[in-house]
């Protein structure tokens, strides 16, 4: 490679951008000496300097159109290419159906590509929130793509032919949380950056007042659920397992074969009794009516794409028990069993001869039953309309933040019965509710923080259970059997029960313990492992945690193991004292806690720094812990105002650049990262984050001020004279055009915006909406050159 370096004037090991490599290749082809193709080819593969910026969905996707040109331009000054990979719902659907599309329409499977990249030391991926699609969302995306000329097959609700089963399997590979388990080849480190936390204390968000007479509570099962039925084993050796259902008549049905497991891996099996679930739900509907509180259910039908839609269907049928008693056979025959929500039932009634009669029965049940919590009071959308509308990790903190209230049909706040059927984690929310009822709302101006170290690598625990979750077709016994024929786990089950198995590999557990010790050491905070002694899985994890803690120097550290309820109480007691506590949790509580505490502390989980140190040495940088904000898109379409806050992107980008500097020895990347952190802090302190109201600063204006601040910081820093020289005129040009550019961003607001699509927006139209200032665009494009 020396001749290439001699020719280019670069030192050996310097990261080289794509444009430079293309230039060298062209010169080689023109016969220039000193650039042997063999060596150039090696250099192209070996020193690829790039950051992958994911294209996702909804509000983060729209923000990407505005922010990514800035990121590309600034990163290029350090020789770093920023490349896009499309892992949007639309992109993932298209990647599964190449054989249905024209050659020009076909797209690569970017998710599979990134999954492989995440297992290499070179990985540097910025991951924005994406849709975890429910069936209604899948159908809407498919219909939109079909309208755009893609010859996709319809989503088959009840596949019967081999072709329909194949189509359904392809769509199901995209459904639910299909993205994160593929990319998360490491454990999770999520925390509020100091600048963000300080800003939240200085400018506290609104918290609803709690009353000691509040009737809000969580309702959860006390037996026969996933928590109480769990059995768990630690594998003594590598093995291949089979999951089968042995019927009452002795017939065997294989539910899952060729399940490869490793020595030290924790394997669990458990089930939810459908009969017990129905009894529990009937009691809660009656309780809500008697107590005069809103009835609501809080599940995660997106991530838990097999089990939770079934649970949601049970809730719908329990609330409308009289309707299903009378019309259940007809509704089930039409595929309207409640699992896709009330909206899908209402839409399907149009095709039934007595649809109006059944609709009247639903209306009567709504009028006579307990009041339902509303997703949108103005539009009459209830908590039971769409499974993906109410997601527990976001909906419960929002309720707690709003005095324990949800919204009723009149658009008023009201106390709520929050039904969370499985009791594994419900106690966390009840503990916080009880504390708020006794001591009042938390104070964001003084409260401490609860960062999280989460076990999630290699599809750990429940979030990797989808391919091992089954709605049991007949009474019998589910057995998990090893290759020698020994039964490791078994459960007596009944038709309709939901049975699932989980896997948690040993290497991720060891890495999780190491990360917890590291974060406790670096932060000086106590760390609590949230493990439930009543759960078989958690008892096994406790044994392993105690074992692996001995591998680390924990002298002077405060590391303990407590049940989730006890850990919650200790953490919130410390929060009220202004003290900080790391929560070290499994995969589900990682998800729940990184919404619960940030929403209480900061008002949103989108402002969290979310780093995944990949086990192979690369880095995955997630932009906050929030979702993809469909209501933000709705507002943009209606009045051309995008209130999405890209703070999560700013934080992730800085960490990505810093990781690049450390792994590639790129000093310029470190300068960019430090300058970006200072620019972000200035943005917060000067109040240049997006407003919720049209006619005020939005996402685009916020991006302008981030760019201006970043350019100023780079122009005035003294660590890299080249960067200072590059950005001095950029900062000057941006400052001179500030009034013109920001006026443009305000002037376009107030009227509808045409994106040319929701799941698959038009590139041309969306660019026009998100980059309306030709002056700003010209300055950024000038940096690239």
Language model feature labels by segment:
Residues 30-48:
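Short, Lys/Arg-enriched N-terminal segments with co-localized hydrophobic residues
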Residues 49-313, 325-544, 548-560, 564-566, ...:
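Extended, well-ordered protein cores
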Residues 724-732:
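Short, charged, amphipathic alpha-helical segments
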Residues 742-758:
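A glycine-biased, small/acidic residue-tolerant capping/turn segment at secondary-structure junctions
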Residues 761-785:
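C-terminal accessory extensions/subdomains outside the catalytic/core fold
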């Amino acid at each position: 490679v020396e001749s290439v370096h001699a020719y280019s004037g670069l030192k050996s090991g310097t990261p080289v951008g794509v444009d430079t490599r293309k230039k060298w290749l062209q010169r080689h082809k023109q016969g220039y000496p000193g650039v042997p193709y063999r060596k150039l080819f090696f250099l192209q593969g070996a020193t690829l300097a790039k950051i992958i910026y994911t294209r996702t969905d909804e509000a983060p996707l729209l923000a990407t159109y505005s922010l990514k040109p800035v990121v590309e331009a600034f990163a290029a000054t350090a020789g770093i290419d920023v490349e896009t990979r499309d892992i949007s719902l639309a992109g993932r659907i298209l990647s599964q159906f190449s054989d249905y599309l024209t050659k020009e329409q076909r797209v690569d499977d970017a998710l599979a590509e990134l999954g492989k990249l995440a297992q290499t030391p070179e990985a540097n991926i910025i991951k924005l929130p994406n849709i975890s699609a429910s069936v209604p969302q899948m159908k809407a995306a498919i219909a939109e793509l079909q309208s755009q000329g893609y010859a996709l097959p319809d989503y088959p609700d009840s596949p019967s032919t081999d072709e329909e089963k194949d189509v359904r399997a392809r769509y199901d590979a995209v459904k639910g949380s299909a993205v994160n388990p593929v990319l998360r080849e490491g454990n999770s480190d999520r925390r509020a950056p100091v600048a963000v936390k300080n800003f939240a204390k200085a400018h506290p968000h609104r918290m609803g007042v709690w009353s000691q007479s509040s009737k809000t509570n969580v309702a959860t099962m006390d037996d026969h659920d996933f928590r109480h039925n769990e059995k768990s084993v630690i594998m003594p050796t590598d093995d291949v397992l089979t999951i089968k259902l042995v019927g009452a008549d002795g017939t065997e049905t294989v539910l899952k074969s060729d399940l490869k497991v490793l020595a030290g891996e924790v394997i669990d099996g458990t089930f939810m009794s459908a009969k017990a679930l129905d009894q529990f739900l009937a009691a809660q509907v009656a309780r809500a009516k008697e107590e005069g509180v809103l009835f609501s259910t809080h599940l995660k039908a997106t991530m838990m794409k097999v089990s939770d839609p079934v649970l949601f269907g049970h809730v719908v049928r329990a609330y409308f028990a009289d309707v299903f008693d009378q019309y259940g056979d007809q509704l089930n025959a039409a595929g309207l069993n409640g699992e896709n929500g009330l909206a899908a039932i209402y839409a399907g009634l149009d095709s039934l001869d007595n649809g109006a009669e059944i609709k009247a029965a639903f209306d009567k049940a709504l009028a006579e039953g307990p009041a339902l919590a509303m997703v949108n009071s103005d539009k009459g959308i209830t908590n039971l309309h769409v499974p993906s509308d109410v997601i527990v990790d976001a909906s419960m903190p929002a309720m707690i933040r709003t005095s324990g209230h949800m919204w009723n049909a009149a658009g008023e706040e009201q106390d709520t019965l929050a039904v969370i059927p499985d009791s594994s984690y419900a106690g966390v929310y009840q503990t916080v509710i009880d504390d708020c009822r006794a001591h009042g709302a938390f104070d964001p101006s003084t409260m401490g923080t609860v960062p999280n170290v989460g076990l999630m690598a290699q599809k750990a625990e429940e979030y990797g259970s989808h391919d091992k979750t089954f709605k049991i077709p007949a009474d019998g016994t589910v057995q998990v059997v090893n290759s020698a024929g020994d039964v490791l786990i078994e459960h007596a089950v009944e038709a309709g029960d939901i049975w699932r198995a989980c896997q948690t590999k040993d290497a991720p557990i060891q890495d999780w313990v190491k990360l917890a010790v590291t974060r406790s050491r670096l932060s000086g905070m106590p760390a609590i492992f949230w493990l439930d002694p009543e759960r078989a899985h958690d008892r096994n994890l406790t044994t392993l945690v105690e074992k692996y803690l001995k591998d680390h120097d924990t002298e002077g550290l405060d590391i303990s193991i407590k049940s989730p309820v006890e850990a919650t109480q200790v953490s919130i007691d410390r929060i009220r004292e202004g003290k900080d506590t790391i929560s070290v949790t499994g995969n589900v509580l990682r998800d729940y806690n990184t919404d619960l505490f940030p929403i209480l502390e900061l008002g949103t989980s989108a402002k969290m720094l979310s780093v995944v140190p990949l086990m192979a040495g690369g880095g995955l940088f997630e932009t906050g812990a929030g979702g993809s904000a469909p209501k933000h898109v709705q507002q943009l379409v209606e009045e051309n105002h995008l209130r999405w806050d890209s703070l999560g992107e700013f934080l992730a980008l800085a960490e990505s650049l810093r990781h690049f500097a450390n792994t590639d020895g790129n000093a310029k990347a470190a300068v960019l990262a430090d300058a970006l952190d200072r620019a972000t802090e200035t943005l917060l302190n000067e109040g240049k984050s997006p407003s919720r109201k049209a006619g005020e600063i939005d996402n685009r204006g916020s991006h302008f001020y981030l760019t201006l601040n970043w350019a100023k910081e780079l122009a005035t820093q003294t660590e890299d004279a080249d960067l200072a020289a590059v950005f001095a005129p950029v900062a000057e040009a941006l400052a001179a055009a500030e009034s013109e550019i920001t006026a443009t961003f305000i002037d376009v607001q107030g009227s509808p915006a045409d994106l040319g699509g929701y799941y698959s927006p038009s590139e041309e139209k969306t660019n026009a909406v998100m980059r309306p200032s030709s002056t700003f665009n010209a300055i950024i494009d000038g940096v690239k050159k």
